[in-house]
Structure formats: C-alpha cells, structure tokens
Amino acid sequence: FDSFKVQTPYCYRCPLGKNREECSIDCLGAVEEVLKKNAGEIAAIVIEPLLLGAGGMIVYPVEYLKGIWELSRKYNVHLIVDEVATGFGRTGKMFACEHAGVEPDFMCLSKGITSGYLPLGATLTTEEVYKAFYDDHDKLKTFYHGHTYTANPVSCAAAVASIDLFKSDNSLENAAVINRSLGSFLSGMAELSFVGDVRSIGVVGAMELVKDKKTKEPFGLNERVGLDIYKRGLENNLLLRPLGNVIYFFLPLCTKSEELDDIFSRASIILSGG
C-alpha cells in the first residue's frame, strides 16, 4: 500500500527544537497537515502507542497519542495501534492505549499474549468494523482472512494460560514496582558522561549513548559502542541488547526485587567500565 510518513515524536532529539518543559505537542501539526491534504485517500493511521520499539525504545508523551486518536476521529480515518510489544502489561497497564484513554479501531497483538513461549498473533477490532463484513453469504461481504496456522491449539493454550495469570496474580502491580526500581537505576546512569538520555515506561527502560552530552552528537555507526557493551555484558552473565546507540531493558513482569538488584548491579559495573 502507498503510505504517508511523519516525523517520530522524539523528545530527546525534537525535530522542532523544543524541550520537554516547553513542549505543546506541536509535532501533531505535521500529522494534521497530511490528513487535511489527503484524508480522502487515507484509510487508517498506524502507530505504536507510547513506545517506539525498533526505533530505539523511544517513549513519547501521552498527549501525542491522544491527539492522534482525536485527529483520526476528526478526519474519519481508522486508527490501528500496534501493541505487539507494548501489550499485556509492558507499559504498566494491560494495553498502552489505556494511558491515553484511546479506543482504536484495530489493535494488533502478539508476543505477550503467550508470554513469549509460543508464536501467536491476534487482531482485535470494533463491532462497527466487524459488522461491515457480516452479512448473508450471497452479499459477498466476507473478509476471507484465514491462513494455515490460524488458532493453533498449542499456541492458543499458552495464550489462555498466560492471560489466566493476569487474572490470578499481581503482574500489573509488580510492573509498578519494577518501574520504580528501573527509574532509580536509570537516574544514576544518566550521570555518566556518555549517557545522553534515559527513558522508561512500565517495565521498559533505555539509555541513549552519545559521544558528546552537550551537543548530543551520537557515536558513529562503525564505533559499535552498543556492541562493545553487549559483549562486556555477556562476560558478566548479563544480556544487554543494543539497538544501535541505545541500550535497553525489557524486563519480565515476574521479575523479583532481588533479581532487579542483581541486574542493575551488574549493569552499573559494566557501564561504568568496572
């Protein structure tokens, strides 16, 4: 499909040159401009809610997500949210959309639906969209979307077991505990000369490494700083996965306090060059 793209709401490297204190979510203007000019051609807006994963674990303001939803209503286009990485408690709520009170037209789910034990994906939609394809067979309105591994029983069993855990334990409460510990650790790491930005939401945290803290100059692609830290982590029995110049944590909801202490203690030693 043809698509239109707008700049990422990236607060640390704001394309409008603003900082968090003076931000009024002006970056929504670029989205509205595209919608104004092309609303008749646009079927939907697709977005990762609150956390841009592969882009560098970029956490953006709740107001931006809410603004996107309001624009989708204003210009009568569907809103599709990709909760593959953010769903099932990763941001501190069951789904990231809840932080902004957003009700999307489509929600894409995977990963956490089975706690990662088996592959499974799901697409949720509204009653209105469902009814658009619901009619007598001879009306030819059916959306034929089946595929070979639909409703794989083993994956579905894993999903049911995973969802049952949310009903029976305190996973979301534990996410808040993890976030406090993660935030405290990241605040300490922010003092390092090569850490330009730290950000977190729920059980996800990230540090953006820079060559120059004042100018925000990034390390060059060939310097492989993230890879060096990853290798040092392995030597200390800790997996610190880099995304370019970003080192991030994607912690399980069941992580215990003593495990957090161990993880952050090892990470501090590795990042401090110990």
Task: Give the label of every model feature segment.
Residues 1-274:
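Conserved N-terminal phosphate-binding loop of PLP-dependent enzymes in the Aspartate aminotransferase
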